[in-house]
């Protein structure tokens, strides 16, 4: 049986990346919450 998780960096960044988060109001809210928690990585695309 084929596994469900087939990793793709491009798809990952397009759905969860920084620019995608910044594009919507809710995405910006997520980033603000992560900043408030002092997360070192705000999104999956940030190094």
UniProtKB/Swiss-Prot annotation:
Gene3D superfamilies: 1.10.287.3980. Keywords: Ribonucleoprotein, Ribosomal protein. The keyword ATP-binding does not apply. GO terms for biological process: translation. GO terms for cellular component: ribonucleoprotein complex; ribosome. The keyword Endoplasmic reticulum does not apply. One of its GO terms (molecular function) is structural constituent of ribosome. It holds the Pfam family Ribosomal_L34. Belongs to the bacterial ribosomal protein bL34 family. This is Large ribosomal subunit protein bL34. It comes from Buchnera aphidicola subsp. Schizaphis graminum (strain Sg). The lineage of its organism: Bacteria, Pseudomonadati, Pseudomonadota, Gammaproteobacteria, Enterobacterales. The gene is rpmH.
